[in-house]
Curated annotation (Swiss-Prot):
Function: Forms part of the ribosomal stalk which helps the ribosome interact with GTP-bound translation factors. Is thus essential for accurate translation.
Family classification: Belongs to the bacterial ribosomal protein bL12 family.
Cellular component GO terms, alphabetical: cytosolic large ribosomal subunit
NCBIfam families noted in UniProt: L12 (TIGR00855)
Domain of life: Bacteria
UniProt key word Oxidoreductase: no
Name of the protein in its database record: Large ribosomal subunit protein bL12
Subunit field text: Homodimer. Part of the ribosomal stalk of the 50S ribosomal subunit. Forms a multimeric L10(L12)X complex, where L10 forms an elongated spine to which 2 to 4 L12 dimers bind in a sequential fashion. Binds GTP-bound translation factors.
Native organism: Chlamydia trachomatis serovar L2 (strain ATCC VR-902B / DSM 19102 / 434/Bu)
């Protein structure tokens, strides 16, 4: 591929929504028969010696939508649209086939606010540190 075509590809990928990126990830995993799970690495040196804190507080969080009762879908759908800026169709898809990541790489306070809004609408949602 030429540099120009790679730049075009990067521009196209940059324009995708979170939902579209999630779908792309699934398609690539199926096509290449791989998973996007991070490898587990055993770290013995510095952590065992006490040079690093045992558990550092994460600075980035992901908001995971785990469950939406059928009688609460419309309210949750409105909140998903509000917090993500997705169109109606994409937001509806986000509330189906759970769990789904609603937001990624967001601050702790933003993640907590988003979880609170989703829970107030009737959904089961959690914030997980990245």
């Amino acid at each position: 591929m030429t540099t120009e075509s790679l730049e075009t590809l990067v521009e196209q990928l940059s324009g995708l929504t979170v939902l579209e990126l999630s779908q792309l990830k699934k398609l690539l995993e199926e096509k290449w028969d791989v998973t996007a799970a991070a490898p587990v690495v055993a770290v013995a040196g510095a952590a065992a010696a006490g040079d690093a804190p045992a558990s550092a507080e994460p600075t980035e969080f992901a908001v995971i939508l785990e469950d939406v009762p059928s009688d609460k879908k419309i309210g949750v759908l409105k909140v998903v649209r509000e917090v993500t800026g997705l169109a109606l169709k994409e937001a509806k898809e986000m509330t189906e086939g759970l769990p789904k990541t609603v937001k990624e790489k967001t601050s702790k306070s933003d993640a907590e606010d988003t979880v609170k809004k989703l829970q107030e609408a009737g959904a089961k949602a959690v914030a997980k540190g990245l």
